[in-house]
From Swiss-Prot:
GO molecular function, one term: flavin adenine dinucleotide binding
Family annotation (PROSITE patterns): GIDA_1
Quaternary state and interactors: Homodimer. Heterotetramer of two MnmE and two MnmG subunits.
Known role: NAD-binding protein involved in the addition of a carboxymethylaminomethyl (cmnm) group at the wobble position (U34) of certain tRNAs, forming tRNA-cmnm(5)s(2)U34.
Family statement: Belongs to the MnmG family.
Protein residues bound to NAD(+): 284-298
GO CC term, one of those recorded: cytosol
Name used for this protein in its record: tRNA uridine 5-carboxymethylaminomethyl modification enzyme MnmG
Length: 685
């Protein structure tokens, strides 16, 4: 039957990508339908019970800055919070949280059920409705046909999924859930380039069978250790609107290690390993290898650290992070019991590997819309990524762009200098994947600007402009932005000099007496000098006219005041580095945002090698920046392409343009670039 209601956006799949996609489209005012094979598993954490980490935490903060749900749900469900790389620079500091699976899923479900313009429907999708070269809806397993202007596919590991435990395997989307075999077959019929990837998960352990007295405790930040050692730092918060008061009871993680005996037992199972015997065809994640892969690749290491992570407050289940495996169950059990504290471990669920289909993200436009099928968007593991955070970011992005298309508006996009989400999208659509892609800070060229702490400053205004950000978040953002601006100006315009700050106080606070007059911002630039230090100096130098944390706390509240002070300290201390990176961004912008003509026939650019012409024709990059990141497209090839465009007299590519000159206005070029078909090459560049 044809369902009587037509939707603006249909989202297929209810994992981390699907839920963010559906919420984003609905927040933007589009009538949105979320189709899932099981409403009870919406927002389920299929693998590890954690959110965030290096690079990943940055994505979560960006999703939050754009109005997404992941950070807020983590604040409501997180049972341990830590700041990773806390001793390093602000660009690579990252928030990570252990989450209670049940609480996290409930937090996501609550948001989905109460979001205006969003409908939920429990049915697996078996087919897409395609008319000509455009998708117009989806068909469920019992033949219900839903029509929509756009469709977002977020199928995760379900497309023709197959679980492996030893040499035994069976069809599944994940443990306990059926695969999406019919939908996978339908996508292959549409001639969309695809491949196989694999990921895995470790066996789960009953905590009652673990001897924690033998293990090393790892408490979270902001929590006193079991021996009474006080917390050395405040408890982190994920959402810009969150607070530590939202966190449930906190729990520690525990550390054990594999040993030589563990490795010996694991090796005895290699002849029954689906990975080593060639049963698994898909490529696994490089940065989250199985334990058998680790001991095979790093044979010189006799031990690997294993983190025992609690699955929640109301369960005894533990997740042993570091021993993902697809070896036979008898090997899993024997190996686990060789580890300290795990001698009597009881396994609740076996570890397994799962193979699944993904579709080549190089066949997507910058908006994540398919180049082949109009209105069809892809997000999450179907694009070849791995990780909840990468999926959530893609889901929000694809959902927003599906909504914008349904509304008749231009797509949303982010540059590599604007967001980790921009880096993620650009990497996927220009480079593609040969293994599951995960985010790291090292993937971003401009990471000093792409910090966790300023994700809202970078993105919330953009999110507001397209309807992603509600009034509550917008008001909070403006309060923070105004406070940062106001306080920055006050620090720059408030001066102290030797006559009013005694030498003894100056030496105590700054290490030496002041030589001349300084404003507070200049003093804060010194190593080891904080906002509180200059505030104390001002209290002494100008009693009654002072800047202080207490003043900000009373004006803004403690959480917002702390965020404002963090922004002030980073912006002032790293101003020189940030300014230099801004110059790098401006230099790169000349090429990065310069759009290539849609009608450009690369086969006619005879100065280019056959390989380069072939790759440019295949991938059809939208900008010169994207073209530069395609494998095999060299700087020399770009120069030859520029010469061709100049000879063709495309707007912005005239004979007088100099490659090394200052940036040409990309906006001016892009206005008319596609209105000027190439002429015969008659003049010199």
């Amino acid at each position: 039957m044809l369902y009587p209601q037509e939707f603006d956006v249909i989202v297929v799949g209810g994992g981390h990508a699907g839920t963010e996609a559906a919420l984003a489209a609905a927040r933007m005012g589009c009538d949105t339908l979320l189709l899932t094979h099981n409403i009870e598993t919406l927002g389920q954490m299929s693998c590890n019970p954690s959110i965030g980490g290096i690079g990943k935490g940055h994505l979560v903060k960006e999703v939050d800055a754009l109005g997404g749900a992941m950070a807020a749900a983590t604040d409501e469900s997180g049972i341990q919070f830590r700041i990773l790389n806390s001793s390093k620079g602000p660009a690579v500091r990252a928030t990570r949280a252990q989450a209670d699976r049940i609480l996290y899923k409930a937090a996501i479900r609550q948001r989905l059920e109460n979001q205006p313009h969003l409908w939920l429907f429990q049915q697996a999708v078996d087919d897409l409705m395609v008319e000509g070269d455009r998708v117009v809806g989806a068909v469920t397993q019992v033949g219900i046909r839903f029509r929509a202007r756009t469709v977002v596919l977020t199928a995760g590991t379900f497309l023709d999924g197959k679980i492996h435990v030893g040499l035994n395997n069976y069809p599944a989307g994940r443990a306990g859930d059926p695969p999406a075999v019919s939908l996978s077959a339908r996508l292959k019929e549409l001639k969309l380039p695809q491949g196989r990837l694999k990921t895995g998960t470790p066996p789960r352990i009953d905590g009652r069978s673990i001897d924690f007295s033998k293990l090393i405790e790892q408490p979270g930040d902001g929590v006193a250790a079991a021996d009474g050692t006080p917390a050395s730092s405040p408890m982190p918060v994920f959402s810009f609107l969150g607070s530590a008061a939202q966190h449930p009871r906190q729990m520690p993680c525990w550390i054990t290690n594999t040993n030589q005996r563990t490795h010996d037992i694991l090796r005895t199972g290699f002849d029954r390993s689906p990975m080593f015997t060639g049963v698994i065809e898909g490529v696994g994640p490089r940065y989250c290898p199985s334990i058998e892969d680790k001991i095979n690749r790093f044979a010189d290491k006799n031990s690997h650290q294993i983190f025992l992570e609690p699955e929640g407050l109301t369960t005894n289940e533990y997740y042993p992070n570091g021993i993902s495996t697809s070896l036979p169950f008898d090997i899993q059990l024997a190996a686990v019991r060789t580890m300290l504290g795990m001698e009597n471990a009881y396994i609740l669920r076996p570890g397994y590997a799962i193979e699944y289909d993904y579709f080549d993200p190089r066949e997507l436009k910058t908006s994540f819309e398919s180049k082949a099928i109009g209105g069809l968007f892809f997000a999450g593991q179907i694009n070849g990524t791995t990780g909840y955070e990468e999926a959530a970011a893609q889901g929000l992005y694809a959902g927003a762009n599906a909504a914008l298309q349904a509304q008749g508006n231009p797509p949303l996009s982010f540059g590599r200098d604007q967001a980790y989400l921009g880096v993620l999208v650009d990497d996927l659509i220009t480079k593609g994947v040969t293994e599951p892609y995960r985010m790291f800070t090292s993937r971003a060229e401009f990471r000093l600007q792409l910090r966790e702490d300023n994700a809202d400053m970078r993105l919330t205004e953009i999110g507001r402009s397209v309807g992603l950000v509600d009034d509550v978040r917008w008001d909070a953002f403006n309060r923070k932005r105004d406070a940062v601006s106001r306080e920055t100006e006050r620090l720059k315009s408030t001066w102290v000099h030797p006559a009013i700050l005694p030498a003894a106080d100056s030496e105590r606070l700054f290490g030496k007496a002041l030589e001349h007059e300084y404003n507070l911002a200049d003093l804060m630039r010194r190593p080891g000098i904080s906002y509180d230090t200059v505030a104390e100096a001002l209290t002494i130098a100008r009693p009654g006219n002072y800047v202080s944390r207490e003043t900000l706390n009373s004006q803004l509240g403690a959480d917002l005041a702390a965020a404002v002070i963090e922004q002030l300290e980073i912006a002032i201390k790293y101003a020189g580095y940030i300014d230099k990176q801004n110059e790098d961004v401006q230099r790169a912008a000349h090429y990065e945002h310069l759009r290539l003509p849609d009608e450009l026939d690369y086969a006619q650019v005879t100065a280019l090698s056959f390989e380069v012409r072939q790759k440019l024709t295949k991938h059809r990059p939208e900008t010169l920046g994207q073209a530069s990141r395609i494998s095999g497209v060299t700087p020399a090839a770009l120069s030859l392409l520029l010469i061709h465009l100049k000879r063709g007299r495309f707007k912005g590519f005239t004979g007088n343009d100099k490659v090394a000159a200052g940036p040409i206005s990309a906006d001016a070029v892009n206005t008319d670039i596609n209105d000027n078909p190439a002429h015969a090459a008659t003049d010199a560049a």
